[in-house]
Amino acid sequence: MSTYLIGDVHGCFDELKSLLAQVAFDPQQDQLWLTGDLVARGPGSLDVLRYVRSLGPAVRMVLGNHDLHLLAVYAGISRNKPKDRITPLLEAPDADELINWLRRQPVLQVDEQLKLVMAHAGITPQWDIETAQLCAREVEAVLSSDSYPLFLDAMYGDMPNNWSPELSGLARLRFSTNALTRMRYCFPNGQLDMICKDAPGTAPAPLKPWFELPRLVDADYTIIFGHWASLEGRGTPAGVIGLDTGCCWGGDLTMLRWEDQQYFTQPANRRDLLDGVHQQAAS
C-alpha cells in the first residue's frame, strides 16, 4: 500500500489520470490524498468529481475555496463565471448527487499514524492541532446540514481576520473557512491578511507567508497544503509541503508518494490551458 498526495487538480482530469497511471495507482490497495480545489479553471471538473467520488474510501480529500464556490453557485448564491468552466458540471444529470457528496467532504484531514495534517490553504499559526480539528468539524457540520445555503451566503468576506476562542456563529465559521481554504499571508501576530496574493518575496512588509511564522501544531506533524500555485512547491520549511504547482495555468500536476518521499509530475495539456499565462495569484 502506498499513500499518494496530489496538489490542486482544478478540473485537469486527463492530467490526473495520467499522473496516477505513472504509479499504477490501485484504489484497492493505495490511498489518494487531494489538497482540494478539485474543480474550476480546467476543462474536466465534471469528470474529476465523478472519478474521485467513484474511488470511495481510497480517497482522503479536503475542500478548497473553489469547491466551496461551486457549492455556492449551485445553490444560487454566487454567479457562474465562464472562466471557471463548470457549466457542464452544473448541467449534468447527476449534478445533485455530486454536489451533495461534495458538501459532505472534510476541510481538514489528520492522520495520527502517518503524522499528516492536510488543509487546502494550510493551518493558521494561531491554531494548535486540537483547535484546527474543532473549527474544521464546525464548518463540516454546517456544510453537511440542511442549512448549508445560509452558511454559503455568509462565508464570503475577509473579517474577522484574527482568531479568538470567543468568536461564535457565522463570524467564527467565516474565520475558520478563510484560514483553512483562503489563507496565504499573515501579520507577525498571526492575524490573517486576505488581500495580498503576491508571490513570496514581493509581498509588502510586515506580511509573511503563514508557514514562516512560529507554529502551534506539534512538530511531529507534516502539514500538507495546496492553494498557492505561485510557490511552485518551493520555499516551505521542514514539516510543511506545498503541492499546488499550477497545472491549470500551464504548470504541472504534482504528486508525492509519502512512504519514500518520491515526487511525480504530469505537465499540463497545452490545449486545455486557460486564456492568459500563469495567472496563478488569482487561484
UniProtKB/Swiss-Prot annotation:
Q: Which GO terms describe its molecular function?
A: bis(5'-nucleosyl)-tetraphosphatase (symmetrical) activity
Assigned EC number: 3.6.1.41
What chemistry does it catalyse, as a reaction equation? P(1),P(4)-bis(5'-adenosyl) tetraphosphate + H2O = 2 ADP + 2 H(+)
Where do the coiled-coil regions begin and end?
A: none
The top EC class, named as a word, is hydrolase
Q: Which residues cross the membrane?
A: none
Classification via Pfam families: Metallophos
What InterPro entries is this protein classified in?
A: ApaH, Calcineurin-like_PHP_ApaH, Metallo-depent_PP-like
Q: Which keywords does this chain's UniProt record carry?
A: Hydrolase
KW Chaperone (keyword) present: no
What family, per the record?
Belongs to the Ap4A hydrolase family.
Main role? Answer: Hydrolyzes diadenosine 5',5'''-P1,P4-tetraphosphate to yield ADP.
Q: What is this protein called?
A: Bis(5'-nucleosyl)-tetraphosphatase, symmetrical
Gene transcribed to yield this protein = apaH
